[in-house]
């Protein structure tokens, strides 16, 4: 069996050494070289033709993002960003995913052990290789379509940045009209006014979520999201989405009450579920082992939703490797919720949605574009 050829690019000799040893000690991987900067890396990519590259963002002579952009344009290879990204640089990690990085892994820091990070990197290298052809073909196709549209929207959004504040104020006024019919409906069955939208995503999800949320507006029910991401990245990702969308988008906090028109992104490194408190739905953050290799796990979110929100849920499972979310989606469907899996054509990695379809967990299979209308319709229904 051919081994997966890996090139390690990092300006730190220590990191190169640690990663090299980890790669060499895995029976499925072959370390074909290391590089201290993008210029050396470029030559080695041409000469050695690696299957997967690990790349640091902060490097001398050329930063990792510029290099990533060039590689994805001229010589696309799955690239995993391995970087000690501080809070202020998290935007660079989000940008890397937009530019086509397969995934992002945080270097060991704080309570995160070296062993845990190494396991994560090895897992991601294998996953990226397994998905290589499909991922690169999809990336090329989608970067031409909705990523270029996103860029246009971002440019327009920066001009109309102030518009959001005005819209939010009006949205707030319109968000809580006192409606006696609503109240009587609410009292007759708490469930009927508790509409909720839940979304799960992994590889390719950052771009998919940007696309969804830049195309949604208006008075939608609360939206809860699990996007697989390392701790500390999710806060910055939520900020970024918030800048691009007229919806209020934030990182979820434990025990906060869900509001209409607000999107709650699960923090990295901890599971998110929902709990009911006096008729209100609240965020429940809790620790625990990884589920389907993930924390936060989509299954954990969907599972808790199936218990507390019953049939008043629209749940969408987007692009991503593996099968996290498929079982949870089935539970929501069995409780009478409406479930949607992303179609193969619009998914960068068709793993999680495919698993859901195999489990017969999806009421509907839809493109990312159609999901916008499904969400809007559900919000109005």
Please identify what each model-predicted range represents.
Residues 7, 32-33, 340:
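Conserved beta-strand positions in the Rossmann-like core of class I SAM-dependent methyltransferases
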Residues 2-4, 13-24, 39-40, 46-47, ...:
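Conserved acid/base catalytic micro-environments in cytosolic active-site loops
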Residues 9-10, 35, 53:
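Conserved sequence signature across two-component system core domains
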Residues 28-36, 44:
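Short hydrophobic/Thr-rich beta-strand motif most characteristic of the beta2 strand and flanking loop
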